[in-house]
Amino acid sequence: LKTALIVDWPSVDATSGSIMSEWEWQVTSELMKLADFKPDLIAFAHPAYVQKWGTLFVGGKVGGELLPFAKSCRDKLVEKLRGYDVVLTLGAHAMFCLTGEYKIDTFRGTHVDSPLVPGLQVVPTYGPPLYARTAWNERPVVVSAMRKAKQRFVDKPRTIYLPDNIADLYAFSTQHIGDEIVFDVETNKSCRITEFSVATSSACCLYVQLEDMGYQSQWSERDELDIWLWLRFLADRKDLAWGFHNATFDLTYLDKYAIKPKGPIFDTMLRHHAWQPELEKSLGFLASMHLPTRAWKHLRTRAKKDFNKAGAL
């Protein structure tokens, strides 16, 4: 596996011939040692320190067209990385040069296929000025990204079941549900459940949409009642464990529908808080820290025109 580490540009106080300041390099080296990350190449995306990122773009618009010199630097970087497998980018500009994406909080800690370098996967994370100088609490995030950059992401087959009728729900529970499920709901401003998903493994999930964003039901009144009765059927099983992320939220909504799981309840948010109480608790953050997964939270926002379909997946 051929790996590289690319930073945005040399630090403001980096010595001649260096990419980072002495302190930034000390911190980065310690994090690389913790992650056992040993890149074959360490380089920058832009050869000179930049105070304001927008000055590299036409009209100062970040994420738009690069100015000629910045574009030529990007092109040189692309050529240099041909033949590499995985690149860890430290900073938003390095990520942008290889992926075209500029929102680092959205893609940080995930594998992104580069549209510019065939076969290259990019794992973005924060730059040295942040984790070495101002935000020490982001260092575990950087270590996690370094660990992810040691291997390529491999997409695994997944099956998402979309029921056409009530019989499909019972067929799913008979064929796929054992003694444990994980459950998630999405709701609207009227405090109704608009969609939910039930997963039995990382490769098997059932998704049910109840309403669209226009508050229009996707089922007949009789069928919707039967959907809730199916969930109550699952909730009555004392041998069925239910997993949630922030169980209080989901269970509060289920309770309004008289659905009260009688089996064991486990909550990944509370488990992580007990393990690492100082870290963020959102599902997107935890997935980027601990799971080999693609970025997905932004897809829900982009899908609003399609009524947030698959929002609960």
Label for each model-derived stretch:
Residues 140-185, 189, 211, 224-227:
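N-terminal accessory regions of nucleic-acid-interacting proteins
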Residues 28, 184, 196:
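Conserved hydrophobic/aromatic pocket- or pore-lining residues that grip, position, or stack substrates
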Residues 1-154:
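A polyanion-binding, active-site-adjacent surface
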Residues 84-92, 182, 239-247:
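Acidic beta-strand-to-loop metal/phosphate-binding motif
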Residues 74-78, 170-174, 228-232:
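Short hydrophobic/charged patches on amphipathic alpha-helices used for structural packing
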Residues 120-123, 128-131, 153-164, 191-194, ...:
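Active-site-proximal helix-loop-helix substrate-binding element of RNase H-like nuclease domains
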Residues 1, 80-83, 174-177, 233-239:
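Flexible, charged surface loops at secondary-structure boundaries
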Residues 5-7, 125, 181-184, 265-266:
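Short hydrophobic beta-strand that contains or immediately precedes a catalytic carboxylate
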